[in-house]
Amino acid sequence: MKEINELKFYDKMANWDFSQIKYKEQNKTNWDFYKKIKENTNEKSLCLDLGTGGGENVLKHYPNVGMIIATDFSKEMIKTAKENYKNYPNKNIKFTLMNNLEMTFPKEIFDLISARHTIINAKQIYECLVDGGTLVIRGVDQKDCWEIKELFGRGQAYKDEMPISEKDYLDLKEAGFTKIEKVQILHNEYYKTEDDLMALLLKTPILDDYSEIKNEDFVHKPIIEEEKFNEYVTKYKIEKGILLKRVYYGIIAKK
């Protein structure tokens, strides 16, 4: 089950900051998570950000709204977020500990709920949104980093029969959302050195062999086989850097 696996992994992460990893980005799809949030909010909107992690993204990129409640199920993440908040004293935001699957807010309170690379409970989100409220999701899809997953023969959601993007879509439809837009987001990353790419793979669950759908035990595997890694680097190293093809999905759902 996606929920169990992600809880086990992210609860161990005290910092989700990749600033030390050197890479360049190339967006191939015109769909920006924070622009979509801005398009669906105003300066009075009450927003909920699920799975906020260490707060780096919500603090830097969230638009100017009335108030942001930012939650995460990891105590270490929330601790980090509160430390990062000290650098943004004018941001109207509150960080609080909460499991996305057991939301503790009143019904029909939020104008917008955002969820970036995290688990969701579609029914509870629907209940917490005001009529006409918006849900904005950006997630990691099954085909993300597919070339390196195929080379290693394993990876996050590698063997799943249904992409997590489709599961989220169906869950939202069942919860009661009537207007749902889902898009595939293609994004290239070019890592400056082998060490930069290795740092990413060691820190993230990209090559962890677990299901996003099934209820399976999950242990983060911080070991990358050198021979296969070198084979990938040889094949995908170009002038811009070492190419990693990212595949995400975006969803906008209206209540």
Feature locations, PLM:
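A short SAM/SAH-binding and catalytic strip from SAM-dependent methyltransferases
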Residues: F110-Q124, G139-D141
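Conserved Class I S-adenosyl-L-methionine
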Residues: E181-K255
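Short, glycine-/aromatic-enriched active-site segment of Class I SAM-dependent methyltransferases
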Residues: D141-K159
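Conserved class I S-adenosyl-L-methionine
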Residues: M1-T41
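Class I SAM-dependent methyltransferase SAM/SAH-binding core
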Residues: L46-E102
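A short acidic, Gly/Pro-enriched loop at the edge of an enzyme's catalytic core
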Residues: L101-L112
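Short alpha-helix
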Residues: E161-G176
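A short glycine-rich, Lys/Arg-flanked "PGG" loop and its adjoining helix->strand segment in the class I
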Residues: A122-V136
